[in-house]
Amino acid sequence: QHWEKNFSNKPEMFGLEPSISAIKALEIFKEKKITNIIELGAGLGRDTIFFAQNSIKVHALDYSPSSIKIIKEKSKKNNLDHLISTEIFDIRKKLRQDSGKYGGCYSHMLYCMALSSFELLKLNDEIYRILNHQGINIYTVRNENDGDYKNGIHRGEDMYENDGFIVHFFSKDKVKSLLKGFKNLSIEKFNEGNFPRKLYFVVNKKI
């Protein structure tokens, strides 16, 4: 609700260009010959559009109705409706998709939202279920080197609230705790934005 209230009024707050993580993810999807992915927490669709422009079929999920509306508008404007489908969805629930449906899953900063470790484990199980044999899950999270870590109101585990937003910060151990059914291929550090946010770029392969 906080996201909906703040970002739907400033629809280009995260920029129009694809994120660094989407550019890196595309290389991996292309290398693995993955052509259909699910994107969780698609936001305003800057990465969704980028993937589709590079011939990847994307099913974009987001909790915010206004975000999904913006993605649909962008998809239509860019003549990408044949490659982009959307769904308003709360990822704390069981995903509606069939088992083994996707070659890849992508999410940028979804795992570091206000989700408990238990909710993250359940989400990871669902991602495992919907990925096909040797499917790839790529996600990014803000890490313990981020300037906001341990700032603001502590909300349990490694979650801190700043300006109304709760962020779940990740250590490498926390990344490794989410490997049930997966093999980690890489954990890479990168920065984003002017602050900058300090993140991990995580690539896991279904086994």
Please describe what each predicted stretch is:
Residues 94-100:
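Short amphipathic alpha-helix with an adjacent loop that forms part of the alpha/beta core around
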Residues 1-30, 38-94, 122, 136-207:
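Class I (Rossmann-like) S-adenosyl-L-methionine-dependent methyltransferase catalytic domain
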Residues 109-113, 118:
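Short catalytic micro-motifs in class I SAM-dependent methyltransferases
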Residues 106:
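A conserved beta-strand element that flanks and buttresses the S-adenosyl-L-methionine
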